[in-house]
From Swiss-Prot:
The lineage of its organism: Eukaryota, Amoebozoa, Evosea, Eumycetozoa, Dictyostelia. One of its GO terms (cellular component) is cell leading edge. Belongs to the WD repeat G protein beta family. Ribosomal protein RACK1 subfamily. GO terms for molecular function: identical protein binding; phosphatidylinositol binding; phosphatidylserine binding; protein kinase C binding; ribosome binding; translation regulator activity. This is Small ribosomal subunit protein RACK1. Keywords: Repeat, Ribonucleoprotein, Ribosomal protein, WD repeat. WD repeats lie at residues 19-59, 68-107, 110-149, 154-193, 196-235, 237-275, 295-328. PROSITE patterns: WD_REPEATS_1 (PS00678), WD_REPEATS_2 (PS50082), WD_REPEATS_REGION (PS50294). CDD domains: WD40. The gene is gpbB. It comes from the Eukaryota. One of its GO terms (biological process) is sorocarp development.
Length: 329
């Protein structure tokens, strides 16, 4: 493996979004509403945040807490018109939310175990979900399940992440069976099964132009694939379990959330552009150990770039969403 060069870009923490009382499991942004982001958490809520980029004291504030799920909320996405949020929960259900009104307008029942991942099609007419019950379900917006992807050619373990292509009738799924699958959503057939991972897959994501897929998980590698053919292209090593991946919306970059840092790669050079480690305040004296306890950096679980690519939002297991900007901006 070629020698890694030193990181070339410095990202600074410009503040945090404070409001969740549990792991921040997912973050969603919308080009339609650049002053809003939405997050999900193990505190059973979906949070709508009002961003305040001109406020030097805080990057944003909690605007509305969407409540209805009875267990951890694992994933949230925003419809492409910016009007609705869709969440998946460990209570085995999905919920559709009217963002403006702050109410749940539809409840999706059908999975028999935790819902791990949800997604909208580019025309907002189809909804997909992946679950610990090892199935992928295809729904309409009325909450009716139209098809279930299961059986021998489907995943044989938890479906941890699922995403729609932005411009073709294709979905990509990742699973704890160590496989990534590429599906034709019209025929409901699996076109490709990708087997390069040697551990469970936590995350899959598709590039903004729909040409690439990236996947990551326990084996510490981000695998890049050609979406149309399923051809493996190359691997990038994170040296720690990958919890989430996100392509930059306007640069040829890929970011990875791991247990100890965020890594940003330049996909043209395959080099690390930046490594982001959160600032950790010194912890108080630990009375049980009778000595100073060494502060442990929180693990990054979720990532999202702002629609213009200038800001990186990162959700952590301490309940904070940290906001990062390049020092050159």
């Amino acid at each position: 493996m070629e020698q890694q060069k030193a990181p070339q870009v410095t990202y600074l923490e410009v503040g945090s979004l404070v409001g969740h009382n549990g792991f921040v499991t997912s973050i969603a942004v919308s080009p339609e509403n650049p002053d809003t982001i939405i997050s999900s958490s193990r505190d059973k809520t979906v949070m709508v945040w009002q961003l305040t980029p001109t406020d030097a004291t805080s990057p944003g504030k909690a605007h509305r807490s969407l409540k209805g799920h009875s267990h951890f909320v694992q994933d949230v996405v925003i419809s492409h018109d910016g009007q609705f949020a869709l969440s998946g929960s460990w209570d085995n259900t999905l919920r559709l939310w009217d963002i403006t009104k702050g109410v749940s307008t539809r409840l999706f029942k059908g999975h028999t175990q935790d819902v791990m991942s949800v997604a909208f099609s580019s025309d907002n007419r189809q909804i997909i979900s992946g679950s610990r019950d090892a199935t992928i379900k295809v729904w309409n917006t009325l909450g009716e399940c139209k098809f279930t992807l299961e059986g021998p050619e489907a995943h044989q373990d938890w479906v941890s992440c699922i995403r729609f292509s932005p411009n073709t009738p294709t979905i990509v799924s990742g699973s704890w069976d160590n496989k990534v699958k590429i599906w034709d959503i019209k025929s409901f057939k699996c076109n490709h099964t990708l087997t390069d991972h040697t551990g469970y897959v936590n995350t899959v994501t598709i590039s903004p132009d729909g040409s690439l897929c990236a996947s990551g998980g326990k084996d510490t590698f981000a695998c890049l694939w050609e979406l149309s053919s399923g051809k493996p292209l190359y691997k990038l090593e994170a040296r720690n379990t990958i919890n989430a991946l996100a392509f930059s919306p306007n640069k040829y970059w890929l970011s990875a959330a791991t247990d100890d840092k965020i890594i940003i790669w330049d996909l043209l050079t395959k080099q690390v552009l930046a490594e982001i480690v959160p600032e950790v305040k010194e912890q108080a004296f630990d009375s049980k150990k009778k000595k100073e306890s060494k502060p442990k950096a929180p693990a990054c679980l979720s990532l999202a770039w702002s629609a213009d690519g200038s800001v990186l939002y990162a959700g952590y297991n301490d309940g904070l969403i940290r906001v990062y900007k390049s020092s050159s901006q």
